[in-house]
């Protein structure tokens, strides 16, 4: 009986020892995989360059949008400014509070503040003020198409869809608490086909919704590799371009292009001295020129291909 017990114990010791060897061997492999991913990120060159940078508008630059005709609107701490395609200043207007996001469609410019949506004409006249929509809110993004205006509220983790009269047509995320928003970055884009793209930053992905709030698809995973989204919450900002998407991250402050399936195409800018925790807001009307508003120095950066 004692011999059997000794035999069993001996076998168990051998199994434990073999298991330790396997685990100990696997750790360096996992570490090498992580190192390989970091190395892969460092080895991919930027395909674009900064062609222009200049101090735009006033203090605390936060947002940018560009029209098909080339007009550039920027916004920040209680202002919206408009520039022509040659970056000549056309006008600057004061806003009731700091601007957090910008969009344009047709003859209208839409500026989000913490609690409201400002409707402006191309000359900067404020025609309407929509909201507040909640007792406490933090609107971080606004986007418009022919029929609708959508905005994202990072405080309440909800997306509002309005008609062009400012009436609420749909609220997404109010009941199911679907959006995970760890920080005040919550971006959305509404396209001309009424597809609504939303950055669910805590999930590290871009989700596509119908105008009725039905989730249709999504892409994105956390990680350091070029095709992944890094940091606690990403993408912080993004815009739709003919090629697909141009996205901005924080943690590793990098701008990249993904195709329409969400697959990595190229880096716009990944080797820079931008503050890691301060991402750049993005806009592009044609996918040829990309505009980026950087709150770190209140400059507008213009990217073109190398």
Residue ranges and their predicted role:
Residues 2-306:
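Eukaryotic scaffold repeat domains enriched in small/polar residues
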């Amino acid at each position: 009986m004692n011999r059997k017990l000794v035999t069993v114990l001996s076998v168990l010791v051998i199994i434990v020892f073999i298991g330790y060897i396997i685990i100990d061997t696997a750790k360096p492999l996992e570490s090498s995989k992580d190192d390989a991913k970091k190395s892969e990120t460092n080895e991919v060159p930027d395909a674009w360059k900064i062609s222009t940078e200049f101090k735009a508008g006033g203090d605390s630059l936060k947002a940018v949008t560009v029209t098909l005709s080339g007009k550039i609107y920027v916004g920040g701490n209680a202002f919206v400014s408009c520039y022509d395609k040659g970056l000549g200043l056309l006008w600057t207007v004061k806003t009731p509070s700091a601007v957090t996001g910008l969009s344009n469609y047709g003859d209208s410019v839409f500026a989000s503040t913490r609690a409201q949506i400002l409707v402006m004409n191309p000359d900067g006249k404020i025609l309407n003020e929509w909201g507040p929509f909640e007792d406490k809110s933090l609107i971080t993004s606004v986007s418009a198409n022919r029929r609708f205006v959508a905005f994202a509220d990072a405080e309440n983790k909800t997306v509002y869809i309005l008609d062009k009269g400012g009436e609420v047509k749909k609220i997404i995320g109010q009941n199911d608490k679907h959006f995970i928003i760890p920080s005040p970055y919550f971006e959305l884009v509404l396209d001309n086909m009424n597809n609504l793209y939303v950055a669910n930053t805590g999930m590290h992905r871009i989700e596509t919704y119908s105008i009725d709030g039905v989730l249709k698809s999504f892409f994105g995973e956390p990680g350091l590799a070029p095709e992944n989204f890094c940091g606690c919450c990403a993408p912080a900002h993004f815009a739709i371009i003919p090629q697909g998407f141009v996205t901005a991250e924080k943690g590793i402050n990098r701008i990249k292009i993904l195709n329409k399936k969400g697959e990595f195409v190229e880096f716009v800018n990944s080797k820079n001295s931008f503050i890691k925790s301060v991402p750049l807001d993005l806009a592009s009307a044609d996918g040829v020129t990309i505009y980026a508003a950087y709150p770190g120095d209140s400059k507008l950066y213009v990217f073109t291909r190398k």
